[in-house]
């Protein structure tokens, strides 16, 4: 984990010790009448970063062998679950009771894990004993608690660890905020008539120190009075707060400070996880904010920093600080982390507004939001960069931390990892769900404007009919496929929002740009090798638009496909189909498989994805945009092209197909040709032309030779053949060598 604390970066090894009976399965139901909801107990199974080793009633020797042999990061000790009681009992292994501090300490040998979670009643003294023995973090319960509250907290804890590389300190605070939201009787979202709720003081606790971020300069030892944090130059991050509307899984209720405080603490901890594991990829000089420029002292510089978070969300920040800080990559990265994690309250509740004074309105239910469960609306203020992070994490089906907090939608964007069992677990603590249709219709009058339902006369789709039939309790022949109902984004291009008060065009002429963004690893390789980028051209056109070769740090698709220039079309299409299925885009893959893929027609022929992809990546990738002549340079190489073609708008059609089928695939593979313009040596967007002699690419606008035609004359099908300046000189020299005797050609 960060600076040696927490879990390993790639995997978290967990040893789970279950005492008494085995883990409760999903068939367990509350004792009582049949109308009471069933609680789906999750299994302890390996997923994502989590690797579980479950031990049922092990001996102390078996436990120590498991801890020593697997480089254990996390030990989970579960108390007894008796069938006639909902309360969790002490830790009993075989016939030995380990409910005393001395007995529990003897269970651990010389090898200690980073974190121990004691799911045992009255565990404060036990936790103190383990903490004194040397365990960095100990999670425990002060009092007696129910197995339902314990399961909710445990599932929240492991879901956050599964999703991202995180520290125990932040993981605990996300899970503890979820516990306060759904398991305590003080919460206004949850009715207080349920005996399954607990008081907040009875919740889980943590022993341990928060991880520190080292911001000491490597050269500080050589300088006087620079051995402490206070003597080092600090930075300032310029960003604006925006109001964000969240949909939380739960019945509608009235806003109160307890609800807002719990959600605020959970989101703050979640964003701290993302920024604690962030990485600075690029920094460049930038103008100061217009309203702040007059307050800068001498020596203060402003930098535009491109940062990727722990879960590969890409953001851009405008920061200012001392030159020593801003021109050192590692020092600047650590200062940004320190400023965000330890100094700034990222999320703020919306106070003194109309929305906090009136009751919640219940938005219209949707199968793509919390799997059709009831939701309520909450507004919070977050920085602009934090909103970008949350919106990039929401469509990720493997990211479970938002589900832990019950967040089902962010500004209308649904959280893709929300499952039906998640909704049932959260609503279990909310008591009886609101199913009365009259009350539901009355609440529809207060729907937020951004979730206004369609007109009643609009024809409903088949999935909507199936969803409504299930809600009404009608018979259904097959289980609804929730994943197929989720909206499929046409692009996962993470937009980097610049500062609103200035334009990137106005960068300083004396920019000290340092591109430290490493090239992604070669396709199929296990690790990444940094590749030095060509130095960007410093002309005025370059300052207007600088585009990286890999604008989105997406997880690579680990497959064995050959390079795009040598692989076969069948191999390519199979790889694309597999990638789309992994990404959850099942609707793009027809039932017939490869014989029917892709299910798109262009110019009366099946869309030629293979040649479309090859031509685009050979010209710099989709982000080059209009620098590619889609009709003249791409469409003419596809099987869909005909000599008698009379199609209009084919360029926009190809772009839409590429965004739908191939854009994410391009970002997850290293097929983009990173060659630069042979004249200006840059890879920016522009009017690209290909030399017919050497095959190199150049910006047509960079070629200032007289006598050239217009760009459209070279870009159109069967147009003029472009010959670059280098080849023109070479051809002229060859002709000169072949001529003699007054210019007569020697045979």
From Swiss-Prot:
One GO MF term: DNA binding
Biased composition, class Basic and acidic residues, residue ranges: 459-471
SUPFAM superfamilies per record: ARID-like, FYVE/PHD zinc finger
Entry GO terms, CC: nucleus
Keyword RNA-binding: no
UniProt xrefs under SMART domains: ARID, BRIGHT, PHD
Domain named ARID: residues: 566-670
ZnF PHD-type span: 674-730
Protein name as it appears in the record: AT-rich interactive domain-containing protein 4
Native species: Arabidopsis thaliana
Name of the encoding gene: ARID4
């Amino acid at each position: 984990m960060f600076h040696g604390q927490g879990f390993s970066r790639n995997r978290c090894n967990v040893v789970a010790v279950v005492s008494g009976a085995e883990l409760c399965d999903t068939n367990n139901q509350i004792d009582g009448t049949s109308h009471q909801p069933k609680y789906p107990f999750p299994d302890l199974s390996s997923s994502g970063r989590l690797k579980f080793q479950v031990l049922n009633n092990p001996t102390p020797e078996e436990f120590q062998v498991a801890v020593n042999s697997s480089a254990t990061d996390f030990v989970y000790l579960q108390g007894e679950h008796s069938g006639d009681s909902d309360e969790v009992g002490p830790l009993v292994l075989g016939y030995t009771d380990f409910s005393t501090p001395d007995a529990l300490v003897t269970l651990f040998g010389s090898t200690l894990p980073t974190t121990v979670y004691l799911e045992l009643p009255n565990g404060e003294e036990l936790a103190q004993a383990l903490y004194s023995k040397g365990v960095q973090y100990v999670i425990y319960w002060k009092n007696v608690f129910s197995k339902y509250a314990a399961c909710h907290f445990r599932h929240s804890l492991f879901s956050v660890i599964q999703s991202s590389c995180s520290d125990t300190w932040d993981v605990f605070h996300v899970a503890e905020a979820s516990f306060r939201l759904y398991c305590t009787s003080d919460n206004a979202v949850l009715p207080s008539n349920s005996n399954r709720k607990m008081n907040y003081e009875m919740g889980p606790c943590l022993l341990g120190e928060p991880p520190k971020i080292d911001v000491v300069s490597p050269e500080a030892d050589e300088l006087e009075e620079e051995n402490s944090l206070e003597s080092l130059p600090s930075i300032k991050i310029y960003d604006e707060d925006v109001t964000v509307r969240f949909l939380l899984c739960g019945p509608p209720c009235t806003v109160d400070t307890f609800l807002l405080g719990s959600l605020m603490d959970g989101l703050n901890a979640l964003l701290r996880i993302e920024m604690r594991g962030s990485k600075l990829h690029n920094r460049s000089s930038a103008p100061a904010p217009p309203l702040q420029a007059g307050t800068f002292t001498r020596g203060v510089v402003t930098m535009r920093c491109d940062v990727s978070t722990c879960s590969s969300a890409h953001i851009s920040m405008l920061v200012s600080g001392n030159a020593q800080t801003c021109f050192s990559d590692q020092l600047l990265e650590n200062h940004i982390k320190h400023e965000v994690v330890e100094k700034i309250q990222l999320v703020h509740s919306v106070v003194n507004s109309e929305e906090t004074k009136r009751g919640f309105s219940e938005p219209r239910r949707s199968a793509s939001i919390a799997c059709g469960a009831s939701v309520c609306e909450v507004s919070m203020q977050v920085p602009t960069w934090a909103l970008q992070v949350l919106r990039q994490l929401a469509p990720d089906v493997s990211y479970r931390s938002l589900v832990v907090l019950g967040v089902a939608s962010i500004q209308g964007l649904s959280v893709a990892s929300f499952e039906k069992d998640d909704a049932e677990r959260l609503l279990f603590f909310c008591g009886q769900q609101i199913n009365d249709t009259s009350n539901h219709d009355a609440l529809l009058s207060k729907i937020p404007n951004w979730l206004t339902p369609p007109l009643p006369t609009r024809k409903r789709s088949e999935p909507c009919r199936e969803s409504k039939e299930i809600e009404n309790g009608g018979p259904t022949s097959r289980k609804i496929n929730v994943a197929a109902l989720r909206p499929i984004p046409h692009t996962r291009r993470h937009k980097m929002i610049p500062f609103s008060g200035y334009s990137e065009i106005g960068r300083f002429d004396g920019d000290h740009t340092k591109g430290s963004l490493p090239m992604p690893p070669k396709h199929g390789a296990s690790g990444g090798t940094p590749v030095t980028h060509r130095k960007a051209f410093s002309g005025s056109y370059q300052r207007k638009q600088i585009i990286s070769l890999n604008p989105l740090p997406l997880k690579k698709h680990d497959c064995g496909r050959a390079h795009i220039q040598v692989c076969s079309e069948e191999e390519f299409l199979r790889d694309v189909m597999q990638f789309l299925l992994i990404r959850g885009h099942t609707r793009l893959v027809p039932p017939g498989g490869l014989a029917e893929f892709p299910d798109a027609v262009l110019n009366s022929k099946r869309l030629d994805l293979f040649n479309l992809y090859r031509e685009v990546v050979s010209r710099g990738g989709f982000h080059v945009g209009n620098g590619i002549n889609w009709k003249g340079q791409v469409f003419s190489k596809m099987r869909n092209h005909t000599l008698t073609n009379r199609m209009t708008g084919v360029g926009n059609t190809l772009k839409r197909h590429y965004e739908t089928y191939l854009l994410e695939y391009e970002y997850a593979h290293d097929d983009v040709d990173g060659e630069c313009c042979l004249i200006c040596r840059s890879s920016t967007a522009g009017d690209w032309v290909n030399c017919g002699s050497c095959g190199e690419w150049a910006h047509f606008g960079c070629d200032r030779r007289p006598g050239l035609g217009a760009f459209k004359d070279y870009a159109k099908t069967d147009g003029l053949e472009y010959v670059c300046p280098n080849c023109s000189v070479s051809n002229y020299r060859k002709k000169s060598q072949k001529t003699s005797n007054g210019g007569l050609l020697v045979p």
